[in-house]
């Protein structure tokens, strides 16, 4: 099968390489000039989307923002997986996404949208509790304050640095944070769903800057026993069906004694838990993408129903800071053949001598993945690869096994389903 990846920042290049390993003919086009050198020598690339490509090509998108292009390609007769105007709206317009959650009967924390820094600063100064900052269009990393003073300082820093003001300030909700994902075929979702725990801070004990994702663990969700499913993402089904949504969608939520609180959606393949999910698939990835591109009904999601997939991100400085390019040409050695199947690479290339090297850009090298019967064993396998690799100035966390095991115990105590509530979502916001 011939595949074409349309990528914004190269997040889906690991998917493209997986398809090559499965024997498919794959090409990719990348929009962001900073990562144009990623995967040189690993996959074939074209400078821009070529509409003369054969109609039998399966096209897939890895990020938000390309919805109009994806829908235009579908209208021209191409089979396109993922990417839609509705998906863009869900991720890039947080106010609308939160409104849709409320319409679906999902409770959300009080939130306010701002398009200028002074108004946001004034709001934070008047607020007595903790706040969460979330940028529309994903231009600035999310931030959770420890109190009103540091949120004011954070906002003033963004203003001084000339960052675009388009953001939400959301009241902090204490509880256990978890992501729940379903794959939707336009009518219904495939079973089982899956859950993800994620840690963002770069260093052990949640110290240091937020890195987007330092590591995660994924497992299949038995929905009949889970409040997150019943009170959370399953309530979105009528809205997803109304929009004939096709692809994966992830609800990030907080679970506490008051129930499930919806925070945000992630409707794209280039999300941080996808590498770990790959280790749990029981079908080839190419078959899975092709089914959703063709619009086939997909009642069964091909994932192991017992055990845990895991991923640990390995980076080099100045990651996670992107204002300065990471060094280019650092060798990545000591990866044995078996490791390659559990290595989801990012800012790397293969030189003329066959040596894998850093490509510069952001300094994200790879997520090393694994599958195990329990959380400790799955994380331990990831750490074995991370320890073995020879990479100058590598950075990764070493405490995720114990951290995620503790979270999992807390989660099992928190997910018992409450008495059913009759919630019928209105469709006033989905037309």
PLM feature spans:
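Active-site "cap" helix and flanking loop/linker of ATP-utilizing ligase/carboxylase catalytic domains
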Residues: 229-249, 266-340, 350-353
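Short arginine-rich
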Residues: 162, 384-400
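Internal nucleotide-binding/catalytic subdomain
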Residues: 143-276
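A conserved helix-loop-beta module that forms one wall/lid of the active-site cleft
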Residues: 83-144, 148-149
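Short, well-ordered beta-strand elements within core beta-sheets of diverse protein domains
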Residues: 216-219, 312-313, 364-372
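ATP-binding N-terminal substructure of ATP-dependent carboxylate-amine bond-forming enzymes
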Residues: 1-86
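A cross-kingdom feature marking charged/low-complexity
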Residues: 399-431
């Amino acid at each position: 099968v011939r595949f074409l990846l349309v990528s914004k920042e190269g997040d889906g290049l690991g998917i493209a390489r997986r398809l090559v390993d499965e024997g498919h003919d794959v090409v990719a086009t990348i929009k962001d000039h900073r990562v144009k050198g990623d995967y040189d020598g690993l996959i074939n690339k074209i400078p821009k989307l070529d509409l003369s490509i054969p109609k039998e090509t399966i096209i897939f998108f890895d990020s938000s923002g390309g919805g109009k292009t994806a829908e235009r390609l579908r209208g021209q007769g191409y089979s396109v997986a993922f990417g839609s105007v509705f998906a863009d709206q869900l991720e890039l317009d947080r106010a609308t996404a939160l409104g849709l959650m409320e319409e679906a009967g999902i409770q959300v924390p009080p939130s306010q949208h701002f398009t200028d820094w002074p108004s946001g600063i004034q709001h934070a100064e008047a607020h007595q509790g903790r706040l969460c900052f979330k940028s529309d269009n994903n231009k600035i990393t999310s931030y959770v304050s420890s109190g009103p003073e540091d949120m004011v300082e954070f906002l003033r820093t963004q203003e001084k640095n000339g960052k675009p003001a388009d953001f939400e300030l959301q009241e902090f909700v204490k509880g256990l944070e978890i992501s729940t994902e379903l794959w939707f075929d336009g009518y219904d979702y495939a079973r089982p769903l899956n859950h993800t725990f994620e840690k963002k801070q770069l260093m052990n004990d949640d110290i240091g800057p937020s890195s987007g994702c330092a590591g995660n663990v994924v497992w299949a969700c038995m929905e009949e026993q889970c409040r997150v499913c019943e009170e959370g993402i399953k309530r979105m089904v009528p809205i997803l069906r109304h929009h004939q949504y096709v692809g994966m969608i992830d609800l990030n939520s907080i679970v506490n004694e008051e129930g499930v609180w919806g925070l945000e959606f992630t409707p794209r393949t280039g999300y941080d838990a996808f590498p770990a999910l790959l280790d749990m698939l029981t079908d080839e990835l190419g078959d899975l993408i092709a089914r959703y591109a063709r619009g086939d009904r997909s009642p069964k999601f091909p994932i192991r129903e017992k055990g845990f997939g895991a991923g640990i991100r390995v980076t080099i400085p100045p990651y996670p800071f992107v204002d300065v390019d990471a060094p280019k040409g650092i060798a990545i050695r000591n990866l044995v053949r078996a490791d390659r199947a559990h290595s989801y690479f990012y800012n790397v290339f293969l030189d003329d001598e066959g040596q894998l090297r850093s490509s510069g850009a952001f300094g994200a090298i790879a997520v090393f993945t694994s599958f195990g019967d329990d959380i400790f064993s799955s994380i331990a396998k990831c750490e074995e690869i991370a320890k073995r690799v020879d990479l100058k100035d590598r950075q990764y966390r070493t405490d995720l096994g114990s951290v995620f095991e503790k979270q999992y115990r807390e989660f099992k105590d928190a997910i018992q389903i409450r008495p059913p509530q009759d919630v019928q979502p209105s469709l006033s916001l989905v037309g």
